[in-house]
Swiss-Prot record:
Domain of life: Bacteria
Organism from which the protein derives: Bacillus cereus (strain ATCC 14579 / DSM 31 / CCUG 7414 / JCM 2152 / NBRC 15305 / NCIMB 9373 / NCTC 2599 / NRRL B-3711)
Matches recorded under InterPro entries: UPF0145_dom_sf (IPR035439), UPF0145_YbjQ-like (IPR002765)
Stated family: Belongs to the UPF0145 family.
The protein's name in its UniProt record: UPF0145 protein BC_1012
Any single Pfam family the record assigns to this protein: YbjQ_1
Length: 103
């Protein structure tokens, strides 16, 4: 499945706009608290284990969105947006959304 942040796919014609699709993943409070309170594993100015957790959450949200698009008969998603939000009790939510299309 093609997934892009752009409104179209170069060299491809969008045959049908199907629906808005999304996916979410929430990281536990202890991870978020540790993320902002401690950087014990910082290497070269980056916190590797936290980046790994954020990537994992983003991948889960993206997979959820792609599965929803597939269920709706789409073979691509355009206009994808990724948001990170701190929600109640210090939990972090990764939310992705886009438009499911058929090319």
């Amino acid at each position: 499945m093609i997934v892009t942040t752009t409104s179209g796919i170069q060299g491809k014609e969008i045959i049908e706009y199907i629906d808005i699709v999304n996916g979410e993943a929430i990281m536990g409070a202890n991870i978020v608290r540790d993320l902002f309170a401690s950087v014990r594993d910082v290497v070269g100015g980056r916190a590797g284990s936290y980046e790994s957790k954020l990537k994992e959450a983003r991948d889960i949200a993206m997979d959820e969105m792609k599965e929803l698009a597939k269920q709706k008969g789409a073979n691509a998603i355009v206009g994808v947006d990724v948001d990170y939000e701190v929600v109640r009790d210090g939990m972090l939510m990764v939310a992705v959304s886009g438009t499911a299309v058929r090319i």
